[in-house]
Design a protein with these regions (language model features):
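Active-site loop/lid in soluble adenylation, ligation, and acyl-transfer enzymes
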Residues: 3-16, 20-135
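Conserved small/polar residues in nucleotide/adenosyl-binding loops
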Residues: 141-147
Length: 151
């Protein structure tokens, strides 16, 4: 069996995920766990992915021996899990990345002190697919080197 057959044998057939995979491969793109694939999605593809994922999450719950039929806490949990993964936990995968903006900060007319920024970080471990939450603190100051170059 060739390596290409083994690599492609896992792919679902006739699904929205398969259509997206074909677009990515045609573009010679990559779709690893940490990659942003938003440029390959049509407007309603996220909703279609949720619909495709829902019965799969229901199957996981069934395999975990959770009574989805009678447990009111588990009613529609497959859909909620699918929505959570697409719209929240992995939203950076399916939405365009934001543009970063740089602002000038010249010593003569700018802020001269230490800038400290605390940013909340929400991510997903690409190995275990579990949420990772934290805070990153970044501090920097404007600096003029002896050569009059600004840093």
């Amino acid at each position: 069996m060739s390596e290409d057959i083994l690599k492609d044998s896992w792919e679902p057939k006739g699904t929205i995920s398969q259509e997206i995979i074909k677009k990515i491969k045609a573009d010679k793109g990559r779709f690893w766990a940490g990659d942003n694939i938003s440029k390959y999605l049509e407007e309603d593809d996220k909703q279609k992915l949720i619909e495709e994922l829902t019965p799969k999450f229901e199957a996981v719950l069934d395999s975990l021996v959770i009574d989805r039929a009678n447990d009111p806490n588990s009613n529609d949990t497959g859909r909620r899990l699918a929505k959570m993964y697409i719209n929240e936990l992995m939203s950076g995968r399916y939405n365009p990345m934001p543009n970063a903006t740089a602002f000038p900060n010249h010593v003569e007319d700018g802020y001269k002190g230490m800038l400290v920024v605390r940013s909340e970080i929400k991510s997903l471990c690409s190995h275990h697919h579990q949420p990772v939450n934290g805070v990153a603190s970044v501090s920097y100051t404007h600096l003029t080197l002896p050569t009059n170059r600004e840093v």
